[in-house]
Swiss-Prot record:
Subcellular location: Cytoplasm
SUPFAM superfamilies, per the entry: P-loop containing nucleoside triphosphate hydrolases (SSF52540)
Entry binding sites for IMP: D14, E15, G16, K17, N39, A40, G41, H42, T130, R144, Q225, T240, R304
InterPro entries: Adenylosuccin_syn_GTP-bd (IPR018220), Adenylosuccin_syn_Lys_AS (IPR033128), Adenylosuccinate_synth_dom1 (IPR042109), Adenylosuccinate_synth_dom2 (IPR042110), Adenylosuccinate_synth_dom3 (IPR042111), Adenylosuccinate_synthetase (IPR001114), P-loop_NTPase (IPR027417)
Regions annotated as coiled coil: none
PROSITE patterns on file: ADENYLOSUCCIN_SYN_1, ADENYLOSUCCIN_SYN_2
Record-level Gene Ontology MF annotations: adenylosuccinate synthase activity; GTP binding; magnesium ion binding
Keyword GTP-binding: yes
GN (gene name): purA
Residues the entry annotates as binding GTP: 13-19, 41-43, 306, 332-334, 415-417
Lineage, uppermost ranks: Bacteria, Pseudomonadati, Pseudomonadota, Gammaproteobacteria, Alteromonadales
PANTHER family hit by this protein: ADENYLOSUCCINATE SYNTHETASE
Name the record gives this protein: Adenylosuccinate synthetase
Catalytic activity: IMP + L-aspartate + GTP = N(6)-(1,2-dicarboxyethyl)-AMP + GDP + phosphate + 2 H(+)
Amino acid sequence: MGKNVVVLGTQWGDEGKGKIVDLLTEQAKYVVRYQGGHNAGHTLVIDGDKTVLHLIPSGILRDNVKCIIGNGVVLAPDALMTEINMLKERGVPVEERLLISEACPLILPFHCALDVAREKARGNNAIGTTGRGIGPAYEDKVSRRGLRVGDLFDAELFATKLKEVMAYHNFMLTEYYKCEAVDYEETLKDALAIADYLKSMCTDVSELLDQARKAGEPILFEGAQGTLLDIDHGTYPFVTSSNTTAGGVATGSGFGPRHLDYVLGIMKAYTTRVGAGPFPTELKNEIGDYLGTKGHEFGATTGRKRRPGWLDVVAMKRAVQINSVSGFCLTKLDVLDGLEEVKICVGYQYPDGTVATTTPLAAEGYEKVTPVLETMPGWSETTFGATSVEQLPQAALNYIKRLEELLETPIDIISTGPDRNETMILVNPFS
């Protein structure tokens, strides 16, 4: 029987999921996105050729793989078409490989307008959203006024529903945020223009995945963002609007949770965060600059500079707990090359002197803590491009071993560069 594997980020996103998903899809029949939207940025480098995907699953470059956008994903039709056209220009037969759930909530222009208006109104308290309408679209879903992909297939009903929801949101835009209203007729025309095209790719995702499971076909579920950005378990309110954790697989695709066999947590050898929010191990010094520059730490979606810091084992333990992580993939180990010493956060010290080894439940708690750091010797040798454990310096191996001890979870894959070939698979999640 084929295995069903989840690949997700265990930090604040940008861990290197796209490369690992692409690598593992060699053994998968289906690759499924189950949450988020085009706020995610997954970078693939194959033989030096770089591809950045935001909405379409990373397996789209494989000719033996069907890619699925599940119901938990909020879908922006214009962003999807931009991505499809980019891939088609490169010779990728997207229509043959991509399937979409009719239950995906739609992101429409008024969602983006609201997102931008709210961030502007927050001023210095801005959350740091991508401004792409993700949050407002999820709000409409939960409020049961949202429009879904399937609504596009009845033009008359769609027009009625759209008019109702736009009256509500345009009132907020003009009267509360003092912004321009979004044009109803233009929004309607643009949405209906691609209805038939989207319909040709729609399917019953839950049924398809269940039949695939019964047939023994391996399925890979691709997470976006990271555990610490989860709407329920992240550094609230500095979080995304979806469930980025393993639990989101079932709700965002309709796949039964008992059928998940392996959860691969992607963990960078250090930590980064983009946008606002607490970050106990953040390095605002020359070492932070070194990590940011060497690691090319700029967001794939927004281009924003990421904030670097030491690896936070306290937060990673929470990620292991929430996701039932089976094993880790350690990425960007090579970025630590050349440092005299490397540090790991093993506890949080509060102002009264007490030390905790578990994370707070909200952003305010994180703001109070100081990281308790364990120092280990660094290494001068390069790990870049290493393809076997024997090629790694002893100090790097000691660092990996210490992480496994602290997390009580094996590191099954090690990534030492951006190309899919620069990877060591010690234990294959599909084996």
